[in-house]
């Protein structure tokens, strides 16, 4: 989001989470970040990279902040169906008086594994859609017709296609958590959604980027250093459990071997 805001000549302000140990969203920090120049709030729930879901109470508070300060809320909901342990997702657009000031972004890439199709959609007030349409028509015109038909099929039968995937990702997540629990110096909170997990590596004494590069070089395991997501995530690395269970186990075993060699 930072690069996109900068491309539009805006100034992105990143709000820190509750703490470096708790990556939950901080309502207090959001309030402090608001200035007379603020135009919008960008949300991502369930969150990449933390896998956290913004709870209903926090969603209501953010909606109130937006109304009080006359702000647009841009909500990225591409992981909203990838939920675990009966987790509940609430879209801010459903809050009172938010329909007229919310931009909902979604994609077929995550829910339907259609990353290569480059298909997504947005729902927003008509005046914003008009501006977006002008931009879209001059950049890409429209998605190819076969892609559009694929999207229609996916959206019309979303439950049929996503149910099996959610079941599989639940198994992968549980295997990941079980394997990481065997590593004494690394901890992980169970993600509520998405297919990402943030592993706390603070006790290893390495910075996240140093850790990630060394792990790749020595064990050929690729992770994302937490610093990529801001200073608040320096103590973490992000793992995506998008591979099959065998490869997840193998990857975590290599991670364990690497940590024990430090």
Question: Residue spans of the language-model regions?
Answer:
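PLP-dependent class I/II
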Residues: 1-262
